[in-house]
Regions:
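TPR/TPR-like (Sel1-like) alpha-helical repeat modules
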Residues: 82-109, 115
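Structural signature of tandem alpha-helical TPR/SEL1-like repeats
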Residues: 19-31, 53-65, 87-99, 121
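Mid-chain, well-packed structural core segment of small domains
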Residues: 61-86
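TPR-adjacent "capping" and linker segments in tetratricopeptide-repeat scaffold/adaptor proteins
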Residues: 1-8
Length: 121
């Protein structure tokens, strides 16, 4: 795997993500993910870009892949739950959001979305 290419793709994707060009960010980040699908930082950034560009099914897939590899990643669980909520799947979202809130009880936003999923389910 060409490491320089992977790094350049990731950096370009992050620049676009930070600039708020979420849809454009998915292009280099997806290419980077294809080069190194095990790299959590790439999958997280790609999931964020998909979520922010309202591509919720694609975001769900990225965050689900992260949770499969790291079941105690509170941020990935939170984002998975948020994606599932956006897809109209509050029952599925409840578990991920409850786990995220349990792992990080200090995160008020996690508790708010957990409670929303419970109420909607």
């Amino acid at each position: 795997m060409p490491m320089a290419e992977l790094y350049d793709l990731f950096q370009r994707g992050m620049q676009l993500l930070e600039a708020g060009d979420f849809n454009a960010a998915t292009v280099p980040l997806a290419k980077a993910r294809d080069l190194d699908p095990e790299k959590a930082s790439i999958r997280e950034a790609l999931g964020r870009a998909y979520f922010r560009s309202a591509q919720f099914e694609a975001a769900r897939a990225e965050f689900e892949a992260l949770v499969e590899r790291a079941p105690t990643n509170d941020y990935a669980l939170f984002c998975l739950g948020r994606s599932l909520l956006e897809l109209g799947r509050p029952k599925d979202a409840r578990k991920a959001l409850a786990l995220a809130a349990g792992l990080r009880p200090d995160r008020r936003d996690y508790r708010i979305y957990r409670d929303r999923a419970r109420a909607a389910a």
